């Protein structure tokens, strides 16, 4: 049973197991709180549970547990509890994740919260620490990539990767109108004249997305759609990006450069 769980489920199971032994001044926080809130996590979940404790000064590392000291005046708890233990609210969780996690991991998780309206992007930005503080620059980089128009973790992942490469003029869910057809693309990069589509396998195998159509018919319609988009004079190229491209920043950079997207060193 345990081996069948993914790392996120194992992390939550460990949090549940540790809950009875936590002090009454503790609350689940950071990535642990993000998983409790139901936010997606790319890559493996951490091996240790995160909590804040308003009676602790500094950070304490234990086997399977990291305790973060926090000023109780700055602690906001959400309405939910996990096995009786309070959980830091969505906004506080987002700020902690943005400061401490890899930018791609943080952006995918927090963008989901923005998309689900669990947090407001502007309010999130207002609560970020100064750039010179620990994790401040990282958190602001993450904030730049957030957009409620992103429709999936893949699009969130793509957006933060672009930001990490210095591409900032990004238009998600842009529409091209051709002879009465309204074609919406995942991303439009007007400075480069490049359309980017996140090319996941799901659209060809998911029954709901297929809507009774044969996968070959969906593929044919995608080709016709792309042909219409390419008729626009401002469109120089159409890039299809997969999860594999995004997993390596160097690989993604090479793909963009091959299509004429200017990436500064």
What are these regions (language model features)?
Residues 1-135, 171, 264-265:
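Short gly/ser-rich loop at a beta-strand->alpha-helix junction or flexible surface loop bordering the NTP-binding
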Residues 114-265:
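Surface segments flanking catalytic/ligand-binding clefts of nucleic-acid enzymes
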């Amino acid at each position: 049973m345990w081996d069948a769980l993914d790392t996120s489920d194992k992390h939550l199971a460990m949090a549940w197991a540790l809950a009875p032994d936590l002090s009454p001044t503790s609350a689940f926080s950071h990535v642990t709180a993000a998983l409790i809130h139901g936010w997606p996590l790319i890559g493996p979940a951490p091996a240790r549970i995160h909590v804040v404790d308003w009676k602790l000064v500094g950070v304490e590392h234990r086997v399977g547990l990291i305790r973060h000291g926090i000023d109780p005046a700055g602690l906001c708890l959400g309405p939910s509890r996990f096995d009786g233990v309070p959980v830091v609210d969505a906004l506080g969780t987002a700020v902690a994740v943005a400061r401490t996690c890899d930018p791609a991991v943080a952006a995918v998780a927090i963008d989901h919260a923005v998309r689900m309206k669990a947090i407001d992007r502007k309010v999130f930005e207002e609560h970020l620490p100064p750039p010179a503080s620990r994790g401040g620059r990282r958190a602001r980089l993450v904030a730049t990539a957030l957009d409620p128009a992103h429709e999936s973790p893949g699009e969130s992942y793509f957006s933060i990767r672009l930001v990490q490469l210095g591409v900032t003029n990004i238009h998600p869910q842009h529409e091209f109108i051709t002879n009465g057809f309204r074609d919406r693309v995942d991303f439009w990069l007007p400075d480069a004249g490049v359309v980017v589509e996140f090319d996941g396998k799901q659209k060809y195998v998911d029954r709901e997305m297929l809507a009774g159509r044969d996968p070959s018919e969906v593929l044919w319609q995608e080709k016709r759609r792309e042909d219409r988009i390419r008729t626009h004079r401002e469109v120089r190229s159409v890039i299809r990006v997969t999860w594999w491209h995004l997993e390596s920043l160097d690989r993604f950079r090479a793909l963009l450069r091959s299509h004429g997207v200017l990436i500064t060193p």
